[in-house]
Amino acid sequence: MKKCIGCGATLQCIDELKEGYINEKLIDRENAYCLRCHRLRNYNENKEVLKEDYIKILSKICNEDALIVHIVDLFDFSNTFLPQIKRLTGQNDCIICANKRDLLPKSVKDNKIINFVRHMANLDDFKALDVILTSAKTLDNITDLVESIIKYAKGRKVYFVGCANVGKSSIINAILKKYSDERKDVITTSNIPGTTLGFIEIHLENFSFIDTPGVFNERQIVNSLSSESMNKIMPKKEIKPINLQLDSKQTVFISGLARFDFVDGDKTNFTFYFSNDLLIHRTKLENADNLFARQISELLNPPTKEEYSNLTYYSRILNFDGEKKMDLVLSGLGFITIKDKCKIKITTVEGVIIYTREALI
């Protein structure tokens, strides 16, 4: 049976509402996309995000001697790193491909980022054979990734695994553009989670690799927002850090999606790493509630009014001792670097995980 080269679904011309539908006039094309993938490629449209039973799919790899390429989002590492992959794939060897290097400041040395990735993986007892930093957008280090795969695969099957939206399909397309003259863009690419439905095996001269379904991560904030808001939240180019010197009893809004209250501490600097399209707005703590009530979905946008009505906010109070430079991370949004002793109240929406780590930058 012929399959869609975008998602791997079996093509059919009978039911437009079912997976794999294609107009019968197009089904005989050599590189055919189903209607859903066609809409995703041309309009970034996805009317139904499918939650795949990825545990069953990945478990099929357990009985194989394979190499796993685990692709993670450097800007949202902890939310896209999947330590359970080791268990689900039978303890097969793994390479970590840390994508979206281009979003982090160029001033940060690659070795520091690699050490950070290894440290975070080791905390979950996840031992990687190699860590490669990549950018599917700029094609940085794609050659290094392929060379590492060839080195460690040793003739075995290679599986690409990762959460939806980490750039897995874009990485594969980058490999194809660099190493294949015939098929320039055979994997569907979109900002919508869950666009790859089934295994897709691709043969190159020196090795073959298999794309697996993007893991639908229910903790990701993108699952609650429109594509327009997502495009503002997800950085498209190098982050421009915003340094703010704050007195205690000051508040900083990250659009309408997060609120940073400097509750107590001496005057100090905080560095905000978020998408350049998100507003970082400072005000007095005593004025913050009123400002939020007046400006949510206006100045503080995203979220839109419709999105805001469906969001739930929660808060945490965190104390920093100033002994180490730390990151206060809002998964899927960004992070704030804190270097001095202080007390912070952080508020954000359900779906965003609040946690701290040793500073990345």
Please identify what each model-predicted range represents:
Residues K2-I68, F75, N92-I95, R101, ...:
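Helix-rich effector regions associated with P-loop NTPase G domains
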Residues F81-Q84, V108-D110, I221-S224:
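Short amphipathic alpha-helical segments
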